[in-house]
């Protein structure tokens, strides 16, 4: 392969690197370069690598408009992201960043839609051929967007699981298994009186899928193990009241599962004022553990893996026939110093 020392070529035009320049540098035809960029035909790995190396060496940037006309694609996907008062934005942004990162690896950009646009937002981007597909977050059990997604001729993936999953492609953490894993962990340690401090009341009122599934797993596992269990919705500003209520109504409580990252700190502070601190009060968390606090037993929220899976599934649907189904990632519980056998 001959060296090209400059982005400027003597073809009588300006100095912009063109697809013909990449083809000449890589020793292939311009159509082969196009196929590598579009993925429309199978190209050998060695040729694909040579073309990619030439693209990088020359600094070639495909023209988005021309590429879209040629492939009938926008090379953009939409992400419907929840931005509302009861959503913990740092967690939502972890999913968003993972989707953007994975999309760029597939040569796609991401158009953000807010939850408030609802079904009309989906119709707008589909009707205007603005995107090649859409990923929807914060899915409710009876989500108004689901019938629209079924009706639109637009590939889609849900990060979350509604009640009716027919003809849908969904991916998420198995939150029911996560709730159950925490119960079994505490029961194995000998706890018989536990509580789940969950999401804000509004999350349950609108029947958000991940929250409902966590409660289901929690309650079924508690019944299976013969453990006394209760649910308390919570938000950071009600955490003290929730702690005081549990201490008053459940004096025998020895285990706590927290599915609400912003409330972890206020809850631990409130219990500590009454002399209840881990591991005397065993505490496990579902989701990210706030920095700076005690090391908590927890089930991690694999936002990066979920986002990457969602993008991969969407690209499969964009490139070929749909294969609907539900993918649930197995929860991984890490035991730390915050849980122990009751005294």
Q: Which residues fall in each region the model found?
A:
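Flexible loop/turn connectors
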Residues: 249-343
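Short beta-strand segments enriched in small/hydrophobic residues
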Residues: 32-35, 72-85, 193-201
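Flexible loop/hinge segments that line or gate small-molecule binding clefts
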Residues: 137-177, 181, 199-202, 286-297
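Structural motif
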Residues: 108-128, 230-249
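Hydrophobic alpha-helical segments within soluble ligand-binding/sensing domains
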Residues: 171-197, 237-245, 301-319
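Amphipathic helical "hinge" segments at domain boundaries
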Residues: 45, 53, 60-123, 133, ...
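N-terminal helix-turn-helix DNA-binding module of bacterial transcription factors
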Residues: 1-75, 343
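An alpha-beta-alpha
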Residues: 182-229, 323-340
């Amino acid at each position: 392969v001959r060296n090209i020392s400059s982005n400027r070529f003597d073809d009588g035009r300006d100095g912009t690197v063109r697809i013909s320049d990449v083809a000449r540098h890589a020793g292939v035809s311009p159509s082969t370069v196009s196929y590598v960029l579009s993925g429309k035909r199978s190209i050998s790995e060695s040729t694909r690598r040579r073309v990619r190396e030439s693209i990088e060496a020359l600094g070639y940037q495909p023209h988005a408009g021309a590429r879209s006309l040629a492939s009938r694609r926008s090379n953009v996907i939409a992400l419907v992201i929840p931005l509302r008062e009861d959503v913990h934005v740092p967690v939502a942004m972890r999913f968003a960043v993972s989707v953007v990162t994975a999309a760029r690896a597939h040569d796609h950009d991401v158009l953000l839609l807010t939850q408030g646009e609802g079904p009309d937002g989906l119709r707008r981007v589909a009707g205007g051929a603005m995107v090649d597909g859409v990923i929807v977050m914060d899915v409710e059990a009876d989500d108004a967007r689901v019938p629209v997604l079924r009706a639109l001729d637009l590939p889609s993936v849900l990060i979350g699981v509604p009640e009716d999953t027919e003809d849908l492609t969904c991916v998420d953490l198995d939150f029911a298994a996560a709730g159950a894993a925490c119960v079994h962990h505490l029961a194995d340690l000998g706890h018989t009186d536990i509580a789940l401090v969950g999401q804000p009341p509004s999350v349950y009122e609108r029947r958000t899928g991940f929250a409902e599934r966590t409660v289901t797993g929690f309650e079924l596992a508690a019944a299976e193990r013969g453990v006394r269990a209760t649910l308390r919705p919570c938000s950071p500003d009600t955490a003290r009241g929730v702690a005081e209520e549990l201490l008053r109504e459940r004096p025998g409580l020895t285990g706590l599962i927290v599915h609400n990252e912003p409330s972890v700190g206020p809850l631990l502070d409130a219990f500590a004022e009454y002399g209840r601190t881990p591991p005397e009060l065993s505490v496990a968390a579902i989701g990210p553990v706030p920095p700076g606090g005690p090391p908590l037993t927890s089930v991690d929220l694999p936002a990066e893996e979920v986002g990457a899976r969602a993008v991969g599934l969407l690209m499969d649907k964009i490139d070929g026939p749909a294969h609907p189904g539900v993918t649930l990632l197995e929860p991984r519980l890490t035991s730390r110093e915050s849980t122990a056998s009751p005294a």
